[in-house]
């Protein structure tokens, strides 16, 4: 299932811009205090670090990702998600715009 709209949020209007503009996101908070972000990764190969555990939900496009300690690239496309442990990192490879929601666990 792909999340298309989210109601009742507080949006951080200033964008987070990473990797010279290859990843742009906006943070938001749900009514219950849960924090998330929504963004896009443009065609590139990047490495992200995590503090909290994350669930990356693909809402459009697709990506290949490789979790820390793995040599295997896996694919995530619209309607799918993947989990990244806390205090870890992951590589992401994108050939078309990858739109996502990051759920912090």
Curated annotation (Swiss-Prot):
Keyword terms, alphabetized: Glycosyltransferase, Transferase
Gene Ontology CC, one term: cytosol
GO MF annotations in UniProt: guanosine phosphorylase activity; purine-nucleoside phosphorylase activity; thymidine phosphorylase activity; uridine phosphorylase activity
Keyword Cell membrane: no
Annotated coiled-coil segments of the chain: none
Presence of keyword Endoplasmic reticulum: no
Record's catalysed reaction(s): a purine D-ribonucleoside + phosphate = a purine nucleobase + alpha-D-ribose 1-phosphate; adenosine + phosphate = alpha-D-ribose 1-phosphate + adenine; cytidine + phosphate = cytosine + alpha-D-ribose 1-phosphate; guanosine + phosphate = alpha-D-ribose 1-phosphate + guanine
Function field: Catalyzes the phosphorolysis of diverse nucleosides, yielding D-ribose 1-phosphate and the respective free bases. Can use uridine, adenosine, guanosine, cytidine, thymidine, inosine and xanthosine as substrates. Also catalyzes the reverse reactions.
Similarity field: Belongs to the nucleoside phosphorylase PpnP family.
Protein name in UniProt: Pyrimidine/purine nucleoside phosphorylase
Organism: Delftia acidovorans (strain DSM 14801 / SPH-1)
């Amino acid at each position: 299932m792909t999340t298309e709209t989210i109601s009742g949020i507080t949006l951080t209007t200033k964008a987070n811009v990473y990797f010279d503009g290859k990843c742009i996101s906006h943070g938001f908070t749900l009514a219950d205090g849960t924090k998330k972000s929504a963004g896009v990764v443009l065609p590139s190969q990047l490495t992200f670090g995590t503090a909290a555990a994350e669930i990356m939900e693909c809402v459009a496009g697709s990506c290949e990702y490789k979790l820390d300690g793995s040599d295997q690239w896996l694919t995530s496309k619209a309607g799918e998600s993947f989990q990244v442990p806390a205090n870890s990192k992951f590589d992401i490879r994108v050939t078309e715009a990858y739109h996502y929601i990051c759920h912090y666990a």
